[in-house]
Amino acid sequence: QARMKAENLKNENELQSYFIHRMESILKEKGKKLIGWDEIIDGGLAPDATVMSWRGMEGGIKSAKAGHHVIMTPTEHCYIDLWQGEPSVEPDTYSMCRLKDSYSFNPVPDSVPAEMILGGQGNLWAESVPTFRHAEYMTWPRGWALAEVLWTGPSKTDWDRFWPRVERHFVRADQAQINYARSMYNAIVTPYYTEDGVLEIKLDSELGNLDIYYTFDNTDPDNFTPKYEAPLRIPKNATWLRIVTYRDNKPIGKVITLTIKELEKRADNTRHVVGNL
């Protein structure tokens, strides 16, 4: 508070900006350059700072337009410590970044001068990644997706051509005993409430050539149980939904088991988020 009063700073954001400006001047004296996470935007950027844009793309876009170099690393595409598939069958963490999300990353939006974007970066924070094998699982195949999109312009990326290459990399990873995630084969479960308040469940997958089978009767699903064709409504007295994916009449994804209460909770959370937009 004394420093804020002495420098006539109105709030903590301006205090942070004051600190960053001082740090930049010290670094310049040492022949170094300041790079900071995009919180350094708050309160005013130092003149020559480079911004690591992680809270989405907007901070990076704004900074690039203002003449600052930017490294794009938005959470929704680049945080590979997040779930990469159905949370109930993934290691515990706090949000979602699927393989397809990483592959859809374009670090150079059309609205900014390309020369101001230095590149992109994938981030694997280790708070919930206790072992090297776990780190491998979180890194691959999303690391391959980020490598391709960061080295290839968006005009040359193609999801339907990419994921078959991922499968070829799986063979190489098996030979090298590298631990990787097969989450792209698992079903995507999206519960929601219709306009008339009825819970429905949409099932999908990241790949376009998988069949999805399900049960509501507490038995394990296979290719002889009902095949998903359209959004599901929950039968009376059902307490569990079980789902599995098949390809060429062979199981390929994990069996996903969710209680109806969990589905209701997820649908409620989605409804609350949408309602607050």
Residues covered by each model-derived region:
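Active-site neighborhood of glycoside hydrolase catalytic domains
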Residues: 1-68
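Generic recognition of stable, solvent-exposed alpha-helical segments in well-folded globular domains
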Residues: 14-22, 55-58, 115, 134-138, ...
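Polar, glycine-rich mid-to-C-terminal structural blocks
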Residues: 19, 32, 47-50, 61-99
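Acidic/polar loop patches that form or flank catalytic/metal-binding clefts of enzymes
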Residues: 24, 28-38, 70-74, 153-159, ...
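Hydrophobic, well-ordered secondary-structure elements that form the walls
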Residues: 27, 51, 143, 214, ...
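Active-site beta-loop-alpha junctions enriched in small/polar residues
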Residues: 39-41, 54-56, 75-77, 123-127
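Substrate-binding clefts and catalytic carboxylate motifs of secreted carbohydrate-active enzymes
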Residues: 82-198, 206-210
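Short, compositionally stereotyped local motifs that mark structural "simplifiers"
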Residues: 157-277
